[in-house]
């Protein structure tokens, strides 16, 4: 079966490698153009491009798939089916119509929950106990296509969005490798999503990780995991970002201390919040490397408020 693979970031590398290793014929890889990256704005290739080149798969990097010339190039690959894994552009109907079997998408959530660009972040913020990955057939409506395969697993209490997104995408690649042959043979009974049960996530912005100490400690602790690695969770300290990398919520703590006030208790570095206290475990002051909160506090005894 001739597969056209569309993906861009590091999390889309594992599914590509798994499909290749399982013997599927990948006729081409479509990925975003090389972009400037880092402080020096060095032109950098997407991780999926580098992986495809290692595997000897032809690579196509259009600026946009809205361009008729790009659509013609996709047709020239003569794919029977397409696979999409974090490509970075919504596919229009003329692109969706190219492969006879359409496009399959790996989405790291238990659809119809958490449609959109940040499903694992959404699950962590909500305090969910379960997470999963779904294989769907793409339709014009975002993440709303019929489900061809789904895997559900417990979400660890210390789950961090970046790590778990990568893990779920890898497991999605394994699931996809199993689904594809059965799908091509017409042996899968697709499950239509119940739109009335759908929930949605939004694109994450840099300001989403800014802490409001009036929020409950449990909410802030979830933020430190949901916004890892980007944008991170931080406060402004002397007009500079002070990142809280790891923390623990003490929901049973109660006091009359103003939210945002630093205090110590039994060797723990704590911050009062709107409900409970947040124990700081690992922090990163501006311009410095990550460090244990206790080490930071020894050199910052004069700071009383975050």
From Swiss-Prot:
Keyword Plastid assigned: no
What does the entry list as the binding residues for (6S)-5,6,7,8-tetrahydrofolate? Answer: 109-112
Source domain of life: Bacteria
Name the reaction it catalyses. L-methionyl-tRNA(fMet) + (6R)-10-formyltetrahydrofolate = N-formyl-L-methionyl-tRNA(fMet) + (6S)-5,6,7,8-tetrahydrofolate + H(+)
* UniProt cross-references to InterPro entries, sorted A to Z: Fmt (IPR005794), Formyl_trans_C (IPR005793), Formyl_trans_C_sf (IPR037022), Formyl_transf_N (IPR002376), Formyl_transf_N_sf (IPR036477), Formyl_transferase-like_C_sf (IPR011034), Met-tRNA-FMT_C (IPR044135), Met-tRNA-FMT_N (IPR041711)
- Extract the GO molecular function terms from the UniProt entry: methionyl-tRNA formyltransferase activity
In Pfam terms, one family for this protein is Formyl_trans_C
Q: According to the UniProt entry, what is the EC number of this protein?
A: 2.1.2.9
Gene Ontology cellular-component annotations = cytosol
NCBIfam families in alphabetical order: fmt
- Functional description taken from the UniProt entry: Attaches a formyl group to the free amino group of methionyl-tRNA(fMet). The formyl group appears to play a dual role in the initiator identity of N-formylmethionyl-tRNA by promoting its recognition by IF2 and preventing the misappropriation of this tRNA by the elongation apparatus.
HAMAP family noted in UniProt = Formyl_trans
Q: Which family does it belong to?
A: Belongs to the Fmt family.
The protein depicted here goes by the name Methionyl-tRNA formyltransferase
Organism expressing this protein natively: Herpetosiphon aurantiacus (strain ATCC 23779 / DSM 785 / 114-95)
Q: What is the lineage of its organism?
A: Bacteria, Bacillati, Chloroflexota, Chloroflexia, Herpetosiphonales
